[in-house]
A protein has these predicted regions:
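Conserved hydrophobic positions within beta-strands
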Residues: 16, 39-41
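Short alpha-helix capping/helix-loop boundary micro-motifs
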Residues: 1-2, 23-27
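A structural micro-motif recognizing beta-strand termini
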Residues: 18-22
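C-terminal structural segments of small proteins and small subunits
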Residues: 48, 52-80
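Ubiquitin-like/PB1-type beta-grasp interaction modules and other compact soluble beta-rich domains
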Residues: 2-7, 38, 50
């Protein structure tokens, strides 16, 4: 099974490995989600529909289905 950003646990750090082909993939790339960039899952909204990530040096909120388009390679766990 391929690791994707929606499967990262809170505080888990990874490198973006690629993007799944799709209409939203170009938008993700424009927002800085490019291979080699560091991504950390920060927290989930109270309703569970949105996940906050730190991508390089900024915060980005994504729906779970959007985060599923980001392929990742986990590198370490960060204790919040």
């Amino acid at each position: 099974m391929e690791a994707t950003a929606d499967l990262l646990k809170e505080g888990e750090k990874a490198k973006i490995a690629g993007l799944t082909e799709g209409q939203f993939s170009l938008k993700l790339a424009e927002m800085g989600c490019v291979p080699g960039t560091e991504i950390i899952r920060l927290y989930e909204s109270s309703g569970g529909s949105t996940i906050a990530y730190r991508i390089d040096t900024y915060l980005l909120g994504l729906r779970k289905e959007e985060a599923r388009l980001i392929q990742v390679e986990p590198i370490e766990t960060v204790i919040p």
